[in-house]
Every structure is written in structure tokens, then in C-alpha cells.
Amino acid sequence: MSAAQGWDRNRRRGGGAAGGGGGGSGAGGGSGGNGGRGTGQLNRFVQLSGRPHLPGKKKIRWDPVRRRFIQSCPIIRIPNRFLRGHRPPPARSGHRCVADNTNLYVFGGYNPDYDESGGPDNEDYPLFRELWRYHFATGVWHQMGTDGYMPRELASMSLVLHGNNLLVFGGTGIPFGESNGNDVHVCNVKYKRWALLSCRGKKPSRIYGQAMAIINGSLYVFGGTTGYIYSTDLHKLDLNTREWTQLKPNNLSCDLPEERYRHEIAHDGQRIYILGGGTSWTAYSLNKIHAYNLETNAWEEIATKPHEKIGFPAARRCHSCVQIKNDVFICGGYNGEVILGDIWKLNLQTFQWVKLPATMPEPVYFHCAAVTPAGCMYIHGGVVNIHENKRTGSLFKIWLVVPSLLELAWEKLLAAFPNLANLSRTQLLHLGLTQGLIERLK
């Protein structure tokens, strides 16, 4: 089965730096609080220290983790653990990630440090032309071997997950702005195959740093930069007809959002909300946000409500954003002066900002983030030091909702039986595991 066939099956049912990329938005249901159940996951920091179990005599390399204590911080630092012959992704920025119930997928990225980028082994230096998978149940990184043409625009592209398919659009190669993309590439993660999505209509310009989301069966792309000109264009790709359309809102030019890149978007099915972003010399405020109304084909400006004690989140670009139902979470980013390490929540019904008590162990920008359907956010990579131009390969996770009893029991089971993934399906069924949980082990 080809990647394109896999896609069809799912279908039927001035420039700024590109060396970083906040992850795309995710959506998923999580259980709310219930008598305090599982609330300890939300207000304490836990260090993961279990080693993966291996049968036989294969050696395990275990990199010790720096112990971090942050008051009221529910962030978990995930250590590097991998088999001989397997390595975690090198430090990077400008990459993107998405998540499902089972894996975190990390694509692309940039690191100008020759040694950190893999040295002579990396033919695409300073970019990373690679797709990684982090398996939640075993805590193991794996670089995926794929067939087909993997795109070469590997910094500040857009990435979304649609069924079993990764959809990649735009991005830039090296030098930034000189080799941008405007194609949609599809990778079926089940069959590990890349394909170019054949589309009709006039495609968007070759850009990077844009934001992208799937809404009601269409792919929406907003903003970005050519490397010289910043954009406020809004395009729509109908995933059924595969036809591009540039939307022309019913607004005066003075009522349009400012041109920008490295912003994020959220949506409620009726409106697309633009969060932050900027240019190489500015970052836009979050006090007021622009929203595109899909029904009226017009931009609206919405005044958000500040935190009663702290006020509004700082203006930022190169941050990350994930979404759980009507709650949108932004973290990290850069405001033009300092790297940010805060996490904020915006409710799309009340437009009230709430600052989470958690603080990122490493303030970071040009990172990526994704949320699982259960409500756990994973944050990977990014730039952690402006003056030294230093990047990280750290991976963190934080529960944004109170975990369900199933998720709490699942994490306890994995911690108690680290060799669970080595058992056969028949053995796992005899142990009483459901098919859904068994799929998360494989």
C-alpha cells in the first residue's frame, strides 16, 4: 500500500531566522478533576529513572539526568535511554512534532554546531533530514527509516497529524529564505512512506514560519515569510478535492493582522485564532488577538482578559502551542529580549488568560511541542542560550489535565513491568490488557 493510498483512506473517512520551530496545535480529550483523583500529577515534579528492560545480554547505555526541583511544577524530565546502535535525536531547533496515543513524531530541525549535528555523518548539515519516533510506553527513541522522497525544507515547516499521516508544508533549507517550499508532503507512519500530495489551484508562496491546522476537512495556512517579506495571507486546501484557495477576507487592509512568522494558531471550528508571532525585530502582543471567522469570511479583533494578579502573558514569537478542546496552552518563546519559560492557558469561550504554576526547567524558543489525546504535552529541543547560540535535545512532559484513572494505572503498570512490550499479543491478552493498550505497546 502506498503512502498516497494510505492518505486516500484517511481522506475518505525579511526574513526571520528559521532555526527553530514551535510545535503545532494538538487536540484531545482529557478527563477533568474528580474528587482530587490524580491531581498529584499536576503539582509536583517527577524524575523518571527507570531503565528499559532488555532480554539477553544486550547492553544499555544510561545517561544520568540532572535532578531538578521546581516548586509546584508538574513537568517531568525524560532521560535519554536507548540501546546500543540507537541514539536520541541530537540537539536542534526549527523542528516540528506531533503526537498520538503511542508515539511522539519529530521531524527536521537545524543546528549549526558541526559536532552536535552529527559531523561527517550528517550529509544535510546543518539541517536534519530525518524523522524520529519516541515511544511513550518504552521511553525509547528510534530514527525511522522511510521510503519515498523526504522533503529538504527542514526548518520552520508546518506539521500536522491526520489519521496515520504526517502532513508537512513549507519550510526552508539553507541559506534561510533561499530554498523555501510550498508543497504538501505526506508520510504514512504505519507504512513509513513519503509521497507528494498532488494539488490543484494556486499554491501559497514558498514560505517558512507559517502556522497550519486542519479544520472541518480543510488545511488552513496563515502567515509566514519568504525570508524577505512577511505575510498575512490565508490559504485553504480542501483535503477532499485537493484544491488550494487563497481566502480574501471582507476587511479593509488596516483591519488585517500584522504580517508575521513563528506564530501559532488555535481554532474552535468557527474561528481561527492567531497567537503571537512577529518579525526578526518584533514580537506581537497577546493582549488582543485576531480571529478569522470562517462563516463571515472576516477578521475580528478580540480583547483577552488578563490574569488578575500577573496581567497578560508577554509578547512572544517562536513559542509553542497545543490545544485541548477549548483550552489553548502556549509555552516558551522569545520576546526580543529574553527567552521565556512560562506556560499560559487561554480559554476560547471566555478569553481568560491563566498562568500555570509550572515553569519550564529550560526556558526555550524555536522548540516543538505536541499533546496526546489524553492531555499530556511533550516539549522537545529548542534554543536555550541566545549569546552562545546553544540548543538542547531535552524532552519533557507535563500533564495539562488531570489524568484519567486509565492513564494513571497505565503509567503505574509500565513502571512496575518495564518488559511488558516484549511480551506477545497472546500473553498480553491473557494478562487482561485491552486491544487498545496492547496497540500502545507495539
Curated annotation (Swiss-Prot):
One GO cellular component, as annotated: nucleoplasm
Main subcellular location: nucleus
Bias-annotated ranges (Gly residues): 15-39
Domain of life from the UniProt record: Eukaryota
Keyword Cell division: no
Entry's localization field: Nucleus; Cytoplasm
Omega-N-methylarginine modified-residue sites: R13
Kelch repeat windows: 87-154, 155-198, 199-260, 261-319, 320-364, 365-403
Keyword presence, Nucleus: yes
InterPro entries: Kelch-typ_b-propeller, Kelch_1, KLHDC10
Gene Ontology MF terms: ubiquitin-like ligase-substrate adaptor activity
Region listing for Disordered, in residue ranges: 1-58
Known partners and oligomeric status: Component of a CRL2 E3 ubiquitin-protein ligase complex, also named ECS (Elongin BC-CUL2/5-SOCS-box protein) complex, composed of CUL2, Elongin BC (ELOB and ELOC), RBX1 and substrate-specific adapter KLHDC10. Interacts (via the 6 Kelch repeats) with PPP5C.
Family: Belongs to the KLHDC10 family.
This protein's name: Kelch domain-containing protein 10
Taxonomic classification: Eukaryota, Metazoa, Chordata, Craniata, Vertebrata
